[in-house]
Amino acid sequence: AGYFDTTFVLKEPTYYTISRNTLYLTPGDDMTIKVTQTNTEAEFSGIGAEANNYMKFRLFPKGGSYLEAGGNLRGDFVSTKALVDSLAAIRMHTLDTLSNVSDAFKKLETARIKADIINSYICYASYSRMFAGVKTEEEMRAKWNEFNVSLTQDVTPLYKGDYE
């Protein structure tokens, strides 16, 4: 643990990662930052803080995004999807209410929300018991392909930008 003061010049907004914290820094930002191992406990104040306070709750794709490493898994895909969609709608609403961020930031984060939804749907197969009882590689492959095809109607609008 320690403290430091640094200044650097940015030509354009960009994301940075420090430990599990994702920062969004833009030219002209002037913040006091407390970085922690637990990203949700990080602290930001000053110019640029609003975007970074929002970023504290960024999901982790390797943990299945909205599935939160299986913690948000429900009894079946339909129930899990309903929860994922609800959590994404809340995240989208939170993003929409930010007032001191650029339209470019909102566009990037809207894309991240969509990507997290898609990732959550796809990761359901890995976190659920969908493959329980499957005995052969062929059977598993067939079940996996069937699941992927079933996702098409839910995922396609997200790729096309039709998510509200």
What are these regions (language model features)?
Residues 110-164:
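Extended amphipathic alpha-helical segments with heptad-repeat/coiled-coil character used for oligomerization
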Residues 1-105:
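A non-transmembrane, solvent-exposed segment enriched in polar/low-complexity residues
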